[in-house]
Amino acid sequence: MFRHHPTRGRRTAGLLAAALATLSAGLTAVAPAHPARADTATLGELAEAKGRYFGSATDNPELPDTQYTQILGSEFSQITVGNTMKWQYTEPSRGRFDYTAAEEIVDLAESNGQSVRGHTLVWHNQLPSWVDDVPAGELLGVMRDHITHEVDHFKGRLIHWDVVNEAFEEDGSRRQSVFQQKIGDSYIAEAFKAARAADPDVKLYYNDYNIEGIGPKSDAVYEMVKSFKAQGIPIDGVGMQAHLIAGQVPASLQENIRRFADLGVDVALTELDIRMTLPRTAAKDAQQATDYGAVVEACLVVSRCVGITVWDYTDKYSWVPSVFPGQGAALPWDEDFAKKPAYHAIAAALNGGSPAPGGNCTATYRVTSQWQGGFTAEITVGNDHTAPITGWTVTWTLSSGQSISHMWNGNLTVNGQDVTVRDVGYNGTLGGNGSTTFGFQGEGVADTPADVTCTPGRPSGTSA
């Protein structure tokens, strides 16, 4: 994974031209983006039907783009202020506050009936230089004053605040920011206390990257949240940024969301994008669509996962290419505002796993090894349509004397000799012409059954 860049980034003209040229050269290999497809509901509406929100970050330089703001205002139920609530914008010199740019975005969201997430009060990046010069004995008071002033200014207008952002290193140790060095471990708790005193109603979040899966960094955040809850420190939620790489969605994402929720806090996926190595191809689009669907499903399974925000919605304004040369195409809309397969995978996942119209799946059974009394087999599940499917069920009949002793990447049910295997959530969404595999170890004589079938979607009332 990677370190989150201090700004959301913007391509230079040269990078943009190069990326467009690369995409143009490889365009025939890219799955159709379906720009004219009429979807029955927006992502925001589909999420609201599930008791969630689906939002986008935005930034002030993008707002004059009328095509951009039309989609921003109609497709999403939530907006995150991407840059202009950060310290360098809101208190550029000590004691002088300026909320003009942030208010422009909040006003726009309110005019569209969208909720707003504040981002972010305390962060080691995008600090004005004067903060570094504050004496150690004064910094806690300065931090409290900054939080109090900004939270009070937007009181009643926001649903969430990212109070502290990215305070941990990859190994789980505390990042040695100016706040950590001059105030110490207590600064995070003190920041939450100050924010709660300024607004008793807004939900207060800790936000970080590379905490989507279980590991040293997420373990450290987990222990901090657990400690805060035990001490009565006012923390309401954890934001998992989810800057991901296609094909590398953490297998423990759903489990990790659930363990934080079990502490009694909400979880939000706050900065979702899934980048790929350019140029785009149909296969890369399919993998990305699968990954977006899997992330959405992981959130939907856990009731306290309250919503998802993409880190802007169009590749035109993605931060990725300016930070990771040769990578990009990370968002559900392309640079021309056409919906990519990822968009339809998100919609399908939010829509309860119903297969896209005309969607179908195939199952190809292959014996991979055999020995006296046993064998292993692999089944490839494929989507033979350009629209994504969410959920699949494969069935077949075991031959006489066969049984299954172990399975991976599938939920197994056996009734007599009848086998039913369903997806396990993370491998349930298949982009257009995408595929996944599961396998098992069997006992008995290996053969290839003639009645292998695949059905897209999930039966009513079931979940991965």
Curated annotation (Swiss-Prot):
E.C. designation(s): 3.2.1.8
Q: Tell me the active site.
A: 166 (proton donor), 271 (nucleophile)
| pH influence on activity | Optimum pH is 6.5, more than 80% active between pH 5.0 and 7.0.
- Name the pathway: Glycan degradation; xylan degradation
What is this enzyme's catalytic activity, as reactions? Endohydrolysis of (1->4)-beta-D-xylosidic linkages in xylans
Give an example GO biological process.
Answer: xylan catabolic process
- The answer to whether UniProt assigns keyword Cell membrane to this entry is no
* Superkingdom of the organism of origin: Bacteria
Is Signal set as a keyword in this record?
yes
What GO molecular function terms would the record report? endo-1,4-beta-xylanase activity; polysaccharide binding
Q: What is reported on the regulation of this protein's activity?
A: Completely inhibited by Hg(2+), unaffected by EDTA.
Q: What are the thermal characteristics recorded for this entry?
A: Optimum temperature is 60 degrees Celsius, more than 80% of activity remains after 1 hour at 60 degrees Celsius.
Q: How is the cofactor bound?
A: Does not require any standard metal (Mg(2+), Mn2(+), Ca(2+)).
Any idea where the CBM2 domain is? 354-457
* Signal sequence extent: 1-33
Q: Which residues form the GH10 domain?
A: 40-349
Pfam families reported in the protein's UniProt record: CBM_2, Glyco_hydro_10
Q: Which UniProt keywords apply?
A: Carbohydrate metabolism, Glycosidase, Hydrolase, Polysaccharide degradation, Signal, Xylan degradation
InterPro entries per UniProt: CBD2 (IPR001919), CBM2/CBM3_carb-bd_dom_sf (IPR008965), CBM2_carb-bd_dom_sf (IPR012291), GH10 (IPR044846), GH10_dom (IPR001000), Glycoside_hydrolase_SF (IPR017853)
The family note in this entry says: Belongs to the glycosyl hydrolase 10 (cellulase F) family.
Task of the protein? Contributes to hydrolysis of hemicellulose, the major component of plant cell-walls. Hydrolyzes xylan to xylose and xylobiose.
The protein, known as: Endo-1,4-beta-xylanase A
Q: Which organism is it from?
A: Streptomyces sp
